[in-house]
From Swiss-Prot:
It comes from the Eukaryota. CDD domains: MPN_NPL4, Ubl_AtNPL4_like. Disulfide bonds: none annotated. May be part of a complex that binds ubiquitinated proteins and that is necessary for the export of misfolded proteins from the ER to the cytoplasm, where they are degraded by the proteasome. Pathway: Protein degradation; proteasomal ubiquitin-dependent pathway. SUPFAM superfamilies: Ubiquitin-like (SSF54236). Belongs to the NPL4 family. This is NPL4-like protein 2. Gene3D superfamilies: Phosphatidylinositol 3-kinase Catalytic Subunit, Chain A, domain 1 (3.10.20.90). Residues 131-272 form the MPN domain. One of its GO terms (cellular component) is cytosol. Keywords: Phosphoprotein, Ubl conjugation pathway. Pfam families: NPL4, UN_NPL4.
Amino acid sequence: MMMLRIRSRDGLERVTAEGAHITVSQLKTLIADQLQIPLHKQTLSTNRDLLLAKTPADLLAFTDLTDPNLPLSSLNLGHGSMLYLAYDGERSIPGAPPVTPAGSFGRKMTVDDLIARQMRVTRQETSHCDSVSFDRDAANAFQHYVNESLAFAVKRGGFMYGTVTEEGQVEVDFIYEPPQQGTEANLILMRDADEEKRVDAIAMGLGMRRVGFIFNQTVVQDKTEYTLSNAEVLQAAELHAESELKEWVTAVVKLEVNEDGGADVHFEAFQMSDMCIRLFKEEWFETEIMPDDDPKLSKMKKEVVVGVKDLKEVDNDFFLVLVRILDHQGPLSSTFPIENRSSRATMRALKTHLDRAKSLPLVKKMSDFHLLLFVAQFLDVSSDVPALAECVRLQSPVPEGYALLIESMANTC
């Protein structure tokens, strides 16, 4: 016997099969029997992007599991493998037996009971963010560090900055990494208010704003059972709620085993659901996570309604709304040493950076967020920092006063 994990809009479920020798047709029959989804409504794929399909035409692009006679073993699927499922319509998910009526002839309902019945947790189908596009240099600088320097052994995070279009498309053009302490399971942000003021001043001059948070999961996390852990959901909800931006994006970088047995770096993007943010703001989440707690479940202080059940533990997948990922080449580079890492930026690094491309105008050399942040330490945060960043945005000549200051800084090493 083997177990296959099936991820759909309803979350993560499991189907039991005899073995990898069964065909796609037999698997669909098992899904119909065990998950109550009719055969003719099922679309299966090994590609997670299936869950982003919005129209029947979109579903036609996923053809890897359309041959009914194809054995699962030919796709290297086995015990514990993940498949993605889309289906039309609604289904009834089995729940707890009905409760006895409240009132004179049943159990009395408290005010908390009534509030809980109004707090119904359902899957949010549509995100407020149409897509998120990562600047290639910024994304590569982040993933390269967690892969090559940290070996995905500890967690690392950063705030994403960029723009949001009227259509809800988010573009990420730089990633700011605050002071932090990462372990195998937790990420503690030791935020520096003064440094964040400088970051926001640079963003203002560039015509950008904070649009999300990115972090990596570690190789020791048991990611076979969850997309985000309970601790990750809490942190993501806290930062999303703090932002007050409805298009706020949470991005995850992870290492996944490929078909050849090697490992690939993979990006995923989500929005925390409206209900998740509401529950966080109204303090329904249990914020103390115990060692024995199941990481795929978020604990509530009071019962909420999930399906037909009153529960105090909610599958984390109910709080996640998948977001489509794109990429682009933005206006900034990411070649200057990045803040708050083990190797710190220095005046010598500034001189090396400026000397590297002597033929370029200074504004081109300054078109690097991490360099702007380093220089911003020596400028007035309310006037000089946004003014210098605006020069970068407009690609206009850097005023002589700033140019002389930057040159003198570089020459002190």
